């Protein structure tokens, strides 16, 4: 066990984490030259296209160090984006050390700081690594100082490397061997194994990636999942090199995969503990918490024939993604669909893109909302993740909205504009620190403001240099109202949203104007209104098309013309009463994108 090293890499998007892991695999001959490709561990197409890591992966490599000994390096790849922070905390729970990889040209980013604190809280050895030192404008000394000032770990003598051209990769491996502590655990104790990740394979069923904390698990043995108590038999186990390599057993300290013919992903929940069925341990590995979705949205198929395929696609996706929540929902405007819960906006975009790309579905997504708490006058508290659950306005004593603590890191030139957008988004400043060239700004912001378009606005005002990390801290009473959209007097449920009362008129006017441009002209007038309760706050009218009914009268008597015009007027009146307005797809999308 003393020659095992379990570590993961903490890095911001684009700081070179996946490239560095490629180099590790090359140096340790994990794959032949022919099998190597860029970003080996990012297995989903969407991961490679967007250049981000979404799912945690693992690789076991044998490295012969300069001291002549061979070490087993278990490297668990982690995502860098704030939406996937639970994936990160799980991966860290399986390690003894973490490499903090920072781009020597860009410096420290907010999400890196957040993940780094998670690692420090879990008592991991954090080792700073400065990557991309081959870039002409790399400033390793300035960045090392930033790491010390912002994160508070000693970065003097931090290992420098360039993963892209392969300089210093062996130095990094030597640093891992020297500084990451060997795992603790007892091979002869009762089995305790943490499930780091599970995914569904069409041939094998559920494949679980586990870190054995204590004991040994062998092929053919029976084990049980602690939270469900269900027992399974091990069909296959082994390690990824990154290819699957079968072994007879996994012992304390090792990281590998287990296949036991489990058909349902919820049979092996991520973060759960496995133990022997006949001689179980009493206590699970700490750190298992159920993931709560933060953002909810309705998803609907454009053609109702696709509904069964959509359900199947969601079930398959949720096999791989334990944090995706869904339940059936019916909307008057959009038909049958599902109410889905996500970790954040990026998570939502990725799920939608995977559904459209991997399962060929055409989807509409309704406006994302967060979970509000409605406190009724009789004291009952209702969690509102869907407007249909909101009680009547008369029955509500107060509505509470979720508040997040946002930590923003920006270069000091942009502080003014960042503070301006935070104030516009109803933020309250908590802290502001100057650290070298960077400024760390902490604000308490309503979550709905953060999930709608805060990240995009932040990126545009800071020219892409701002970075953001946030976590839910509390609920606060807020003056929220439900903004309905009426078209010809009929409510369109898919366009309704919860907004702050101060912004309701402005949001209503903006929404109505946008819909006016998108709803095609009909043979009759179409009234578009935004309303709060019974009060109309904005209105716009799509003018009617008019057929020239007098074209066939050459000259002739005026009363004849009047008769024709009156007849047209009557017809339009009747049409308006019975005619329904088709709202085009773009209208929904444009409202939701805003």
UniProtKB/Swiss-Prot annotation:
Belongs to the TRAFAC class translation factor GTPase superfamily. Classic translation factor GTPase family. LepA subfamily. GO terms for cellular component: plasma membrane. GO terms for biological process: positive regulation of translation. Disulfide bonds: none annotated. It catalyses: GTP + H2O = GDP + phosphate + H(+). Required for accurate and efficient protein synthesis under certain stress conditions. May act as a fidelity factor of the translation reaction, by catalyzing a one-codon backward translocation of tRNAs on improperly translocated ribosomes. Back-translocation proceeds from a post-translocation (POST) complex to a pre-translocation (PRE) complex, thus giving elongation factor G a second chance to translocate the tRNAs correctly. Binds to ribosomes in a GTP-dependent manner. Keywords: Cell inner membrane, Cell membrane, GTP-binding, Hydrolase, Membrane, Nucleotide-binding, Protein biosynthesis. Its EC number is 3.6.5.n1. The gene is lepA. GTP binds at residues 14-19, 131-134. It is found in: Cell inner membrane. One of its GO terms (molecular function) is GTPase activity. It is an enzyme of class 3 (hydrolase). PROSITE patterns: G_TR_1, G_TR_2. It is a peripheral membrane protein. Residues 2-184 form the tr-type G domain. This is Elongation factor 4.
């Amino acid at each position: 066990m003393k020659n095992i090293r379990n570590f993961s890499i903490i890095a911001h998007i684009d700081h070179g984490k996946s490239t560095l892991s490629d180099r590790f695999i090359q140096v340790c001959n994990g794959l032949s030259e022919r099998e190597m490709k860029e970003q080996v561990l990012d297995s989903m197409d969407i991961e490679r296209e967007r250049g981000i890591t979404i799912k945690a992966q693992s690789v076991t490599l044998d490295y012969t160090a300069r001291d002549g000994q061979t070490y087993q390096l278990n490297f668990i790849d982690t995502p860098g984006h704030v939406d996937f922070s639970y994936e990160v905390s799980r991966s860290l729970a399986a390690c003894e050390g973490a490499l903090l990889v920072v781009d020597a040209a860009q410096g420290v980013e907010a999400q890196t700081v957040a993940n780094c604190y998670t690692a420090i809280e879990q008592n991991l050895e954090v080792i700073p690594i400065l990557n991309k030192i081959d870039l002409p404008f790399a400033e390793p000394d300035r960045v090392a100082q930033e790491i010390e000032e912002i994160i508070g770990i000693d970065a003097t003598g931090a290992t420098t490397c360039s993963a892209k051209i392969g300089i210093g990769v062996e130095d990094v491996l030597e640093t891992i061997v020297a500084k990451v502590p060997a795992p603790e655990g007892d091979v002869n104790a009762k089995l305790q194994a943490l499930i780091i990740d599970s995914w569904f394979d069409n041939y094998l069923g559920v494949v679980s990636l586990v870190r054995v904390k204590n004991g040994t698990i062998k092929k053919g043995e029976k084990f049980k999942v602690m939270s469900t108590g269900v027992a399974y038999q091990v069909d296959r186990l082994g390690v990824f090199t990154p290819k699957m390599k079968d072994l007879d057993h996994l012992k304390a300290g090792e990281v590998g995969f287990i296949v036991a013919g489990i058909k349902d992903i919820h049979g092996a929940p991520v973060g759960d503990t496995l133990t022997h069925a006949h001689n179980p341990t009493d206590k699970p590995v700490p750190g298992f918490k159920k993931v709560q979705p933060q953002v909810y949205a309705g998803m609907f198929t454009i053609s109702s024939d696709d509904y069964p395929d959509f359900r199947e696609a969601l079930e398959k996706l949720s096999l791989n993604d334990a944090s995706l929540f869904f339940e059936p929902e019916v909307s008057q405007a959009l038909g049958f669909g599902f109410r889905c819960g996500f970790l954040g906006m990026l998570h939502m975009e990725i799920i939608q893109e995977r559904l459209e790309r991997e399962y060929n579905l055409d989807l509409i997504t309704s406006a994302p909302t967060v979970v509000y708490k409605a406190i009724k006058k009789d004291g009952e508290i209702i969690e509102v993740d869907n407007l249909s659950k909101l009680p009547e306005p008369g029955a509500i004593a107060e509505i509470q909205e979720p508040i997040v603590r946002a930590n923003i890191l920006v270069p000091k030139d942009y502080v003014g504009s960042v503070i301006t957008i935070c104030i516009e988004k109803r933020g309250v400043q908590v802290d502001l620190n100057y650290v070298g060239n960077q400024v760390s700004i902490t604000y308490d912001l309503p979550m709905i403001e953060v999930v709608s378009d805060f990240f995009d606005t932040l990126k545009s005002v800071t020219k892409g240099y701002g970075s953001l990390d946030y976590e839910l801290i509390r609920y606060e009473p807020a003056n929220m109202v439900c903004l309905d959209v009426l078209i010809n007097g009929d409510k369109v449920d898919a366009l309704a949203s919860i907004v702050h009362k101060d912004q309701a008129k402005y949001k209503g006017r903006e929404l109505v104007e946008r819909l006016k441009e998108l709803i095609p002209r009909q043979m009759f007038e179409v009234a578009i209104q935004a309303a709060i309760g019974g009060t109309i706050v904005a209105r716009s009218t799509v003018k009617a098309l008019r057929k020239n009914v007098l074209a066939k009268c050459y000259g002739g008597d005026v009363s004849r013309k009047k008769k024709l015009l009156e007849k047209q007027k009557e017809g339009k009146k009747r049409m308006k009463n019975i005619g329904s307005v088709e709202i085009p797809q773009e209208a929904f999308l444009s409202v939701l994108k805003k």
